[in-house]
Curated annotation (Swiss-Prot):
Residue interval(s) of motif Nudix box: 174-195
EC assignment: 3.6.1.45
Coiled coil stretches, renumbered: none
The keyword Membrane belongs to this UniProt entry's keyword annotation: no
Protein name: Uridine diphosphate glucose pyrophosphatase NUDT22
Gene for this chain: Nudt22
A molecular function (GO) term: metal ion binding
Function: Hydrolyzes UDP-glucose to glucose 1-phosphate and UMP and UDP-galactose to galactose 1-phosphate and UMP. Preferred substrate is UDP-glucose.
PROSITE patterns: NUDIX
Organism of derivation: Rattus norvegicus (Rat)
Cofactor: Mg(2+)
Xref: InterPro entries: NUDIX_hydrolase_dom, NUDT22/NUDT9-like
Residues annotated as domain Nudix hydrolase: 117-284
Keywords: Hydrolase, Magnesium, Metal-binding
Length: 308
């Protein structure tokens, strides 16, 4: 296993649909206050703001743990989520004391992630109609992994479920959180690759990977099938999109080559989130044989409706 990434959860072969995932959102799953208080988080944030005044804080979902039950008639996954923020991420996972915080969390709570923000990300193993996986070269201007190769992705947003107010646990029903989780990965594909929503399948959750370069921050990785060919996808990408500034180029890799991608020079160019997505994708042979194409959605499916 690559030291930059670890696998927290592998879903059953073929992945899980939205209907097979549920969420328990509770303050019990939030980050623990730091042993000496959160003043260091505030100081780190203020320093970062001085250097990069364009950044802004935003609430995020925090992944505490996940429970997979192999029940009949089909497996069910329960995600235990709390709330956190981008500010707390910079002050914990991304801070110079992250390793110490993990050690202290293990000592104090029996959980090395207890003091870390751990905002949950999403990523897409996006496969074209002619069987290519889609990658993006990240811009040098982005905060994380500038210049490296990534899969389309981002974060589910608590704010999307309660616009105009600060999200509170009791205001976020589990069913809506699950919908935001699955729809957010489609939103990221639409925004970053500039693809029409109706060309994308319903996402299938492959598993959860952890970025060890940011102290184990987790990302839910999905399989998404596109009804367009790689050339058509390239043309849409080159015509620009809402987040075109986040990447500088698009890369296509044949799905049959992805199994051995770790043995190629390209692997060293992948950021940890992309490595996690590929490691999980490679553990789902049914999807590599084309079974996922049966999940192509219709644009009228309510669960996939997005505000573009």
């Amino acid at each position: 296993m690559d030291p930059e990434v670890s696998l927290m959860l592998l879903c059953p072969p073929g992945g899980l649909s939205q209907e097979q995932v549920s969420v328990e959102l509770s303050p019990a799953h939030d980050r623990r206050p730091l042993p000496e208080g959160d003043k260091t988080i505030t100081a780190i944030w203020e320093t970062r703001l001085q250097a990069q005044p364009w950044i802004f804080d935003a609430p995020k979902f925090r992944l505490h743990s996940a429970t997979l039950a192999s029940s009949s008639p089909e497996p069910q996954l329960l995600l235990h989520l709390g709330l956190t923020s981008y500010r707390d991420f910079l002050g914990t996972n991304w801070s110079s004391s992250a390793s110490w915080l993990r050690q202290q969390g293990a000592t104090d709570w029996g959980d090395k992630q207890a003091y870390l923000a751990d905002p949950l990300g999403v990523g897409a193993a996006l496969v074209t109609a002619d069987d290519f996986l889609v990658f993006l070269r990240r811009s040098q201007q982005v905060a994380e992994a500038p210049g490296l190769v990534d899969v389309p992705g981002g974060h589910p947003e608590p704010q999307a479920l309660c616009s105009g107010s600060i999200p509170q646990h009791e205001d976020l029903p589990g069913e809506l959180v699950v919908r935001e989780l699955f729809s957010s990965v489609l939103q990221e594909v639409c925004d970053e690759v500039n693809l029409p929503l109706h060309t994308l399948s319903q996402p299938l959750l492959l598993g959860i990977a952890c970025n060890e370069t940011s102290a184990g921050r987790a990302s839910a990785e999905f399989y998404v099938q596109c009804s367009l060919t790689s050339e058509e996808v390239r043309n849409y990408y080159l015509s620009g999109g809402p987040e075109a500034n986040e990447s500088t180029g698009i890369i296509f890799v044949e799905t049959q080559r992805v199994q051995r991608l770790q043995e190629t020079e390209m692997w060293a160019q992948l950021c940890p989130s992309a490595k996690g997505a590929i490691l999980l994708y490679n553990r789902h042979p049914p999807l590599q044989s084309g079974a996922g194409k049966s999940h192509l959605s219709h644009p009228s499916v309510p669960a996939l409706s997005l505000q573009l």
